Amino acid sequence: MLQGFHWYSEGDAKLYENTKNSADYLKELGISAIWLPPAYKAAGGGYSVGYDPYDLFDLGEFEQKGTVSTKYGNKKQYLDCTKTLQEKGISVIVDIVLNHKAGGDETEKFHAIKVNPENRQQNVSDPFEIESYTKFTFPGREKKYSAFEWNFTCFSGVDYALNQEEGIFQIIHDFGDGWEEMIDDEKGNYDYLMYNDIDQRNPFVRKELNDWGKWYHDQVHFDGVRLDAVKHQSPDFYKEWLYNLRSNTQKNIFAVGEYWAPGEVNLLQKYIDTTEGSMSLFDSSLQQNFHIASKEGANYDLRKIFDETLTLLNPTHSVTVVDNHDTQPLQDLEAPVEKWFKPLAYALILLRENGYPCVFYPDLFGANYTDKDKEGNEQEIFLDKVEKIDELLKARQEFAYGFQRDYFDDANSLGWTREGNDDHSGCAVVLSNKDAGEKNMPEVFFTITSAGFQKK
């Protein structure tokens, strides 16, 4: 899989066109699926990355939030892109953001309780009336596709109230008592993340989101979904939502959730269990291990690279990443893997049998952008294309098959062999985070050099 964007991807409605034009190259490299960014209108209009969703039914079709197109293009360009990818044999993974909404059209008055941001179970006020932008009428769409209007009873909390200092306000209504139940007690309860938090206990909301899922598939015919921020949403909701989506479309739609909890692999497994295996999850612990290994250099014991990871615990439900739009430099979860280690990290996810690897867009194409760091200083970032990434992707296609034997017997060098099958010869891989060395393994099938593959 390729994550076909990053936080600072080009604007000006170019992404869909450029992705469509890259389809042949991506297919040649063995990319079998592309995860595209949120495609619906966001509060930030044509400048938004897409994680502040406003109208799920506006795929770049209506004049809303100051634009018809999203940052990435209009609806026609989007559908042309997805159709071309699928015609080339590349599956389309769409980004689903159902945790929150932003950019309400009107304010409403309702009762709420202010809570401690570090412990959302601790109230810091009695119930009182606030006013906030919780009314969504979508005037630019004029009820096309759906007449549903959102009001304060559709949300469990907000982070903004008129005439109040900023904070987290738990909304009082008849569809739920307090926050929705989560599987972990981080921050007391981490249901609330940002903006207007959707209350998925409301049966009218659940029906609207189920209906929207079918509508979205009818429009795009996508093959899979990436589910944003599942850490902050009830596993019961997504178990139901995915069941309905698959039933309504009569397709075994692939699903991967974002539950970002580095070092807490048991929470990831608990979420998978609670959703009855209906989705995979990104292996945030493995990404953290890559980050730490790249920082520590030769002091890192490579034999521990898969310790406490989902890829080790539950490989069939693990999607492996080296970096993503949240861990890249200058982002909230910044934990980038250093340049020298990235070829090793990609070998570890592309050439082994466990996990479903996901390549990050800048690692394949490079990126250059400017933003402020945590101290407020402007920084220019250059992300180079990962050395040998094309060769590693081709090696996966040609050689990474068959039974795997591991040689994890040295702190600074790892090796493994793949024994191949009737159509593929197999391979041997050796990695080192120190000086060059040797490792005795039964057979070496190829090496990767600047000239390409050299078989032995």
Regions found by a protein language model. Give the residues of each.
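An N-terminal domain-start capping segment
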Residues: 1-15, 133-144, 152-174, 270-272, ...
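N-terminal structural segment of carbohydrate-active enzymes
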Residues: 1-91, 99, 106-109, 144, ...
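A short, flexible beta-alpha/helix-coil linker loop
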Residues: 6-9, 195, 327-329, 367
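Soluble non-cytosolic domains of exported or imported proteins
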Residues: 10-17, 72, 76, 203, ...
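Active-site-proximal helices and loops of the catalytic beta/alpha 8
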Residues: 23-25, 48-57, 81-90, 99-100, ...
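Long, low-complexity, polar/charged, intrinsically disordered or flexibly structured peripheral segments
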Residues: 144-204, 218
